[in-house]
Amino acid sequence: LLLHLEAGLEQAGLHAPQWLEACARALFDTACQQAWGVDGEPGFVYTLDWANRPVVHARLHWVHAEACAAAAALLLRTGEAQYEQWYRNCWGFIANHFIDPVGGSWHHELDAHNQPAGTLWPGKPDLYHAYQALLLPGLPLAPSLASNLAGNVTKR
């Protein structure tokens, strides 16, 4: 979101503070370093305590979908290969664990061993985050997702 704000400000001819990119990088990089595979299993654990120890070991679909979108935005903004690698890592994890080829849709939650679970919230999620993870990487950082999509809709 910080990179979308930066791009939107620039598109509007307004000053975009340098800290927007720096903070976007720091947030993403820290999440990858502290939360991915921290308990010995791949994927982002849901929560960490103040000492960066896992509190909730579950993996939630929306966290991984948002990570894909963030990695794609950082790749678009910086061109740095590490963000493409994270994008691919996240999508590989989603494809192997969250997408349900039998029942359709995505599993909302995985347990600490990356098996479908329903401890935090049972059932299938809405597709809001999944759609964003699919659509955002193919769009520019500005204008917004809604504006980008609206500009490509044919009125009947």
List PLM regions with ranges.
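Glycan-recognition and catalytic cores of secretory/periplasmic carbohydrate-active enzymes
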Residues: 1-156
